[in-house]
């Protein structure tokens, strides 16, 4: 029976079904299509209390960041968040958060918050009306000064934002605060981009450039601090820990990670944060705290630079009659051991057990870039038929963009799928994690077996974790199994996540570090003279290369591309930074210089870092920015 379960593949056509790999699928989708996908997602995914508008808004902001079209983001964002002037969507976000956190605002506070939402909507609508009047003087009366309208709106934002930071309700109100901050920062960006057309003076322009930097700092730090305070208080199962994190990333950090990039234009953000999903089965009873998270996080991320092809392992399917001649039986499904497989013959360490013969293999069949995994089923549970017949089931199943399903057992229970996200990695945990593992995060690409402590009852068990992100501009698979990043065909800039390297020397002293105010996570170098190589498929365009780094202490960065070496000496962001305290990193964007991505060839990009003694260094983002567009500050 086990072989039948593992060989059966059902072809199912879903909304995300595609036939060929489109590396720029996000850019090619209309906002209407994205909005419909999130609405469909909400109908099918009732286990996570996330309103679909949060995914739509994040996609809208990323699209605007990657475009030069439209300088009035605030007007369009207002129509998304307050359709037809209604505050219902924002109230829905609050209600969903109340359900998720099992916390409610008292009656007076709820009335106050709803009044603030109504006032915020009215303020934004009135400001947009005044701008329209200014730009169309023949149609309506012209306001005395658009600068006066701008400054009034700025003060109104400051007054209202504070109302979503009320003592005792900071976490509950954080998703609403993030949406209000989206509006405020979009407003400031609009003022800067439209300064000439709106007749804004040079002095006022400088003021709003400072506002964009300062409020990006303040709002980012507030969101990070509020989340981390709550996360540090967790003492719960892995599923609940990951679900809390996913909820906050979709509702808050998808935006926070964009804010620090608002100073750029025409930048395709192809890096991004990960969402993690695991099962909610009764067998996984081990409790975790924030002190365990550095290890868990490193386990889920350790091979993120490789192109995933599937996983294989040993599964068990047994049925035993009840003892003593009693009627009925007990059936058990169990994943005993697993390994994750990547292109190029790369595999992870074993998860669960190590001395079992493989009896299933789950892969994408077609090339993994053409049919990536997008959905997972990871639950487990028990079914009872009558009094004496019990089935203890487990799933650990996945589905590709073409609708093919495979895994250890048959899909059932809640699935994990997010519109626009791909499963770019699979990881997992044993029934019980060893203390020696929990205290020792994995280094970059480390291959470590993850097993329960010796003698653990039922310890030879594996439970998978799916890793979802939006990374899709992958041109091909490098010969060593890693990603080759694809540059856009037009003059749009793009980003590369530092964790998606082709290779890194000094691997045992290189770690992946979680970040919140940055599009994706960082590579932390703990040894001097470390070099990370990235491979990109060029288009012949020139770019200004910016490296987002945190260097607490002095460092020297040398970048080599097309045989040319660029050097940034005495880099130190201890005090010279953007002000965001991002999980211990204080970053600044360093302009390395003008580089060329050679046309139709795979271009190596080497980043070498020399550290002074004691320097803490994070490589946080690699940004290739159009040469004809300067940052807004």
UniProtKB/Swiss-Prot annotation:
Keyword terms, alphabetized: Sporulation, Toxin, Virulence
Cleavable signal peptide: none
Disulfide bond annotation, renumbered to this chain: none
Keyword Iron: no
GO biological process: sporulation resulting in formation of a cellular spore; symbiont-mediated killing of host cell
Domain of life: Bacteria
Matches recorded under SUPFAM superfamilies: delta-Endotoxin (insectocide), middle domain, delta-Endotoxin (insectocide), N-terminal domain, Galactose-binding domain-like
Gene Ontology terms for molecular function: signaling receptor binding; toxin activity
Record's miscellaneous remark: Toxic segment of the protein is located in the N-terminus.
Family to which the UniProt record says this protein belongs: Belongs to the delta endotoxin family.
Listed PANTHER family: ENDOTOXIN_N DOMAIN-CONTAINING PROTEIN-RELATED, PESTICIDAL CRYSTAL PROTEIN N-TERMINAL DOMAIN-CONTAINING PROTEIN
Function: Promotes colloidosmotic lysis by binding to the midgut epithelial cells of insects.
Name by which UniProt lists this protein: Pesticidal crystal protein Cry2Ad
